[in-house]
C-alpha cells in the first residue's frame, strides 16, 4: 500500500491558543492561524438551535472587515467580477469559465484578460487551491505573504486580541487582496453559501452573474423551500449585469425572475444548444452540459461588458471549444487507477449532485463489471439529512436498471490520519467535539444501510480516512479486481487523495 506519511499535527484542538505558534511568518504559521478561525461542532449546533441565520448584519460586518484591510466595495469593481451562485454545479461552472478565459488569453486575440483570478471552495488537498491565478493555485509562498498582509492589517485596525472574521470570511478578504494586488482583470467568484448574505456578495458592479441548478441544501440557513433558497441565491443579481440561470423548477424560476426585476435587470435562461455534446467537454457526466453552456454565456456577457463582444457563434470559436475540452476540475467524476485499483472520485454533496453522480456511475459499467470487490466509500458530516443524500446517490445509480451492486460499504469521517488526526490543511473543526471525530452520523448511515440492504453488502464505519483506505487494501488482497467509488463530500475526496499521496493540480 502506497500512502502519504501523516503530517505532524500543528495544533491542539483543546487549546484556547490554537494556531498561535509558531510566531514566524511561515506557511505553517499561516495555516495554524487560519484554522483558529473555525467554529467547532458544539458552537455550530448551538447556532442551529437558536435559528441564527445570515442577515443584513452579516454584510455590515463584511464591509467593516473589508475597510479594515484597506479597501471599499467599489474597489472590487476593477476586478471585472463573474459571480456564480447555485446548489449544484457552481464550482464546475466557475472552472469552465476560467478555462475558457485562459484559452482566449492564450490565443492572444483579445486584450483582456491579462490575469485571471478564481476563488472557490472548499479545497481538496491544499487551501491554496481556493485562490487561483491563471488556472493555478497560488504558491505557498504567495499564500503566506498575502495571509499575513491581511492578518496584520486586521490587527492594526482592531487590535491583536479582537475577534477576527471567521475562516471563510477571512479567505474571501484574502482573495480580494490577492486579486487586487496581482492586477487581476477577470475574477471568477464562487459563492460560499446562499448569495444574498454570502461573504462574497460585496460586489457592486459585476460583469456577469449566474445561478446554477437549484435544490434543497443548507436548509437551516437558507430556508426549507426551493423558493426561499432561490431568493437567497438570486441575491447576487445586480443592475450592472444580465441575470443568467439554467432551467429550474417553476417555483424557483418565478422567484429568480422577480429578484432580477427588483435589481433592475433581466433574467436570461440558458439552455444547452443541440450541438453541445458530452464528448466536447473535459468533465464527465451529462449533467455538465448545463454548467458548460452557462459558462459560455458568462464569457459572452463578460466580453459584452468589456466592449468587445463575440462576432460569431461561440460554439464555433476555437478558444472556447479548447476551454471546454481542457478544463481541469479535480475530484468531480474523476477516474484513476491507483495501486492496481480502479477509483472513481466525485465530491458531490447535495441531493441533486449525488443523484447525478449515481446516474453517471451507472453509465460507466465498464469500470466495475469485472470487479469482484465493489466498494462504496461514503462520507457525510454536516448536511441536514445525510441519509437522504445517500438515498439520492442510490436513486441515480439504480434508475437506469443497470446500477452497481456494492460488495462492501465503508462510512468514514473526514478525519485524515488515525494517529495524527487531520492533515493541517484539511482540518474541519466543525465536525469535531472534544478533540474527537463525530461518529454518530457515520453510525446512523451504516445502520440505515444494514436495515435497508440486508446482507447484500458488508457495511462498516471507519473513524478516519486512513483506516478506511486500510480496509480497502485489506479487501483488495482477497480479490482479483477491485473498484472503489469515493463520494459524499469533497472533504472525503481530498482526504483520500492525501492518504494515497495523489497530486491534485
UniProtKB/Swiss-Prot annotation:
Keyword annotations from UniProtKB, A to Z: ATP-binding, Cytoplasm, Ligase, Magnesium, Membrane, Metal-binding, Mitochondrion, Mitochondrion inner membrane, Nucleotide-binding, One-carbon metabolism
EC number: 6.3.2.17
GO BP term (any one): glutamate metabolic process
Localisation: Mitochondrion inner membrane; Mitochondrion matrix; Cytoplasm
Residues noted as binding Mg(2+) 1 in the record, renumbered to the chain: 121, 190
Annotated residues for binding of Mg(2+) 2: 218
Needed cofactors: a monovalent cation
Xref: SUPFAM superfamilies: MurD-like peptide ligases, catalytic domain, MurD-like peptide ligases, peptide-binding domain
Key word Repeat present: no
Reactions catalysed according to its record: (6S)-5,6,7,8-tetrahydrofolyl-(gamma-L-Glu)(n) + L-glutamate + ATP = (6S)-5,6,7,8-tetrahydrofolyl-(gamma-L-Glu)(n+1) + ADP + phosphate + H(+)
Pathway linked to the protein: Cofactor biosynthesis; tetrahydrofolylpolyglutamate biosynthesis
Cofactor binding description: A monovalent cation.
Cellular component per GO, a single term: mitochondrial inner membrane
GO MF: ATP binding; metal ion binding; tetrahydrofolylpolyglutamate synthase activity
Sequence positions that bind ATP: 89-92, 332, 346
Main location per the UniProt record: mitochondrion
NADP is among the record's keywords: no
Role according to the record: Catalyzes conversion of folates to polyglutamate derivatives allowing concentration of folate compounds in the cell and the intracellular retention of these cofactors, which are important substrates for most of the folate-dependent enzymes that are involved in one-carbon transfer reactions involved in purine, pyrimidine and amino acid synthesis.
NCBIfam families registered for this protein in UniProt: folC
Family label: Belongs to the folylpolyglutamate synthase family.
Protein name (record): Probable folylpolyglutamate synthase
Organism for this UniProt entry: Schizosaccharomyces pombe (strain 972 / ATCC 24843)
Amino acid at each position: 500500500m502506497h500512502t502519504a506519511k501523516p503530517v505532524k499535527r500543528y495544533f491542539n484542538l483543546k487549546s484556547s491558543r490554537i494556531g498561535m505558534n509558531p510566531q514566524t511568518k511561515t506557511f505553517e504559521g499561516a495555516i495554524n492561524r487560519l484554522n483558529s478561525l473555525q467554529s467547532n461542532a458544539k458552537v455550530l449546533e448551538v447556532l442551529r438551535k437558536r435559528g441564527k441565520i445570515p442577515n443584513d448584519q452579516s454584510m455590515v460586518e463584511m464591509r467593516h472587515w473589508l475597510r479594515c484591510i484597506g479597501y471599499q466595495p467599489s474597489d472590487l469593481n476593477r476586478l471585472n467580477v463573474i459571480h456564480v451562485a447555485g446548489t449544484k454545479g457552481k464550482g464546475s461552472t466557475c472552472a469552465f469559465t476560467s478555462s475558457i478565459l485562459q484559452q482566449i488569453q492564450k490565443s492572444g486575440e483579445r486584450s483582456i484578460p491579462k490575469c485571471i483570478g478564481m476563488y472557490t471552495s472548499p479545497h481538496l488537498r491544499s487551501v491554496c487551491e481556493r485562490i487561483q491565478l491563471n488556472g493555478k493555485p497560488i504558491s505557498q509562498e504567495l499564500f503566506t505573504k498575502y495571509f499575513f498582509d491581511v492578518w496584520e492589517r486586521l490587527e492594526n485596525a482592531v487590535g491583536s486580541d479582537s475577534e477576527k472574521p471567521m475562516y471563510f470570511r477571512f479567505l474571501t478578504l484574502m482573495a480580494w487582496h490577492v486579486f487586487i494586488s496581482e492586477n487581476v482583470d477577470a475574477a471568477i467568484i464562487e459563492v460560499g453559501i446562499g448569495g444574498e448574505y454570502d461573504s462574497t456578495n460585496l460586489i457592486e458592479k459585476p460583469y456577469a452573474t449566474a445561478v446554477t441548478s437549484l435544490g434543497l441544501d443548507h436548509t437551516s440557513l437558507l430556508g426549507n423551500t426551493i423558493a426561499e433558497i432561490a431568493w437567497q441565491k438570486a441575491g447576487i443579481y445586480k443592475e450592472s449585469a444580465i441575470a443568467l440561470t439554467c432551467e429550474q423548477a417553476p417555483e424557483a424560476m418565478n422567484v429568480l425572475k422577480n429578484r432580477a426585476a427588483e435589481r433592475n435587470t433581466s433574467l436570461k435562461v440558458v439552455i444547452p444548444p443541440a450541438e453541445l455534446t458530452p464528448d466536447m467537454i473535459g468533465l464527465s457526466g451529462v449533467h455538465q452540459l448545463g454548467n458548460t453552456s452557462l459558462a459560455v454565456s458568462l464569457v459572452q456577457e463578460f466580453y459584452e461588458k468589456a466592449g468587445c463582444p463575440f462576432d460569431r457563434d461561440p460554439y464555433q470559436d476555437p478558444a472556447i471549444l479548447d476551454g471546454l475540452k481542457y478544463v481541469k476540475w479535480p475530484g468531480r467524476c474523476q477516474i484513476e487507477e491507483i495501486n492496481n485499483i480502479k477509483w472513481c472520485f466525485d465530491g458531490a454533496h447535495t441531493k441533486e449532485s449525488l443523484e447525478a453522480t449515481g446516474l453517471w456511475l451507472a453509465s460507466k459499467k465498464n469500470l466495475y463489471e469485472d470487479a469482484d470487490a465493489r466498494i462504496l466509500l461514503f462520507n457525510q458530516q454536516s448536511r441536514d439529512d445525510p441519509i437522504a443524500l445517500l438515498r439520492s446517490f442510490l436513486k441515480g445509480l439504480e434508475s437506469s436498471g443497470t446500477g452497481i451492486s456494492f460488495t462492501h460499504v465503508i462510512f468514514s469521517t473526514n478525519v485524515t490520519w488515525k494517529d495524527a488526526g487531520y492533515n493541517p490543511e484539511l482540518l474541519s473543526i466543525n465536525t469535531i467535539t472534544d478533540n474527537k471525530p463525530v461518529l454518530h452520523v457515520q453510525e446512523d448511515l451504516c445502520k440505515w444501510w444494514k436495515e435497508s440492504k440486508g446482507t447484500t453488502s458488508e457495511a462498516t464505519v471507519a473513524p478516519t480516512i486512513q483506516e478506511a483506505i486500510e480496509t480497502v487494501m485489506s479487501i483488495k488482497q482477497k480479490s482479483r479486481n477491485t473498484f472503489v467509488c469515493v463520494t459524499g463530500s469533497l472533504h472525503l475526496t481530498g482526504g483520500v487523495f492525501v492518504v494515497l499521496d495523489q497530486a491534485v493540480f
